[in-house]
């Protein structure tokens, strides 16, 4: 089910002191498997210091231009440290084909105004969207609101500047810097206060067709709160978290008072795996791995949705959910890394997508 493919690294470019752009060489695989929509991500698996580590990274390139990812160094992050400091051109990475629900559908007849609001490495999926809109939707325009610590920490700054020069009538950017004061830029983080000032001064932003938000959890919450307060329709808002909010777990969702021992069956690639699981025990994903099932996963934090599956029978509760939409949940989809049984019998299907 995991379906990892060995992919050589074609090139590595330094973006900032603590980030790199990695281009993959797809010549050895069926490139149809690696088709993607702007905004989607790949999952990389690598053995680091004797431990298999999986992480998901958004694709920053145009769909027709192959796959490249931008990786910012995370303090004490196993994968990001490896990719930034140890990976070399020609090395082979184990890569899962692109997936993800945070994407932009391109139509050359569209005449739309898109807004991307992101910070730090959250630029990576939005960058692919910007490129795609500017190249393949000639009637559409894109506004980027981009937060960083300082000018030197901006990923893909040269590319973004080229958009300003080449598409000055269709691309507009507002920069925000939290640790540096620069003329013409927002001073501070992207939050409800800075957005109110920006939108008040640029009222057309309130009438945009779609808002794509990407970055840390607290930034996402602030932006969503601002858009909600201004009655922006939910169907116009898409977001992708690159970390969980500080508010983290909602422990009320977990069944702690009444323990239920459940008979769980999961289906992966047409094969069933059976095991018993307590409602107060590990998540369904961890129990499935323990039972020998080759189930897909990456972040294990309720963010990436790689472990998404569908409940066919029974009920579950989730500790956290930062990636499934309300419609997904209503249709029975769960994040198995966050799911615990709340009924005596559970049937979970990874193939029902």
Where do the protein language model's features map onto the residues?
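Iron-sulfur (Fe-S) cluster-binding segments and ferredoxin-like electron-carrier domains
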Residues: 290, 306-353
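Cysteine-centered iron-sulfur cluster-binding motifs in ferredoxin-type domains/subunits
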Residues: 278, 296-306, 336
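N-terminal pre-ligand scaffold of iron-sulfur
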Residues: 252-297
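FNR/FR-type flavoprotein reductase catalytic core
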Residues: 82-257, 263-267, 272
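Iron-sulfur (Fe-S) cluster-binding modules
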Residues: 1-8, 14, 18, 51, ...
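Ferredoxin-reductase
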Residues: 2-92, 96, 148-150, 161, ...
